[in-house]
Amino acid sequence: MRFTFVLVIAATVAVLGFFGINAEPMPDPHAEPYPDAAINPKSVQSLLG
């Protein structure tokens, strides 16, 4: 009985880990990739047109 319970828990953890569901929060897709990066004047000019 105990072996079956441990086997079910291990299989659940393995499946969730395979699909990428874990304790770490997912990164915010809307976050700036480099928040401390300096603004490049050329990139600003290209954005402004």
UniProtKB/Swiss-Prot annotation:
The keyword Signal applies. Keywords: Amidation, Repeat, Secreted, Signal. Residues 1-23 form the signal peptide. Its main location: secreted. Not found in venom, suggesting that it is a minor component. Negative results: has no activity against fungi (B.cinerea and C.albicans) and bacteria (E.coli and S.aureus). Has no hemolytic activity against human erythrocytes. Does not show cytolytic activity against insect cell lines. Does not induce feeding disorder in lepidopteran larvae after peptide injection in the vicinity of the head and thorax. Residues 24-37 form a propeptide. Expressed by the venom gland. It comes from Eumenes pomiformis (Potter wasp). AXPX repeats lie at residues 23-26, 31-34. The modification Leucine amide is found at L48. It is found in: Secreted. The keyword Signal applies. GO terms for cellular component: extracellular region. This is Venom peptide 3.
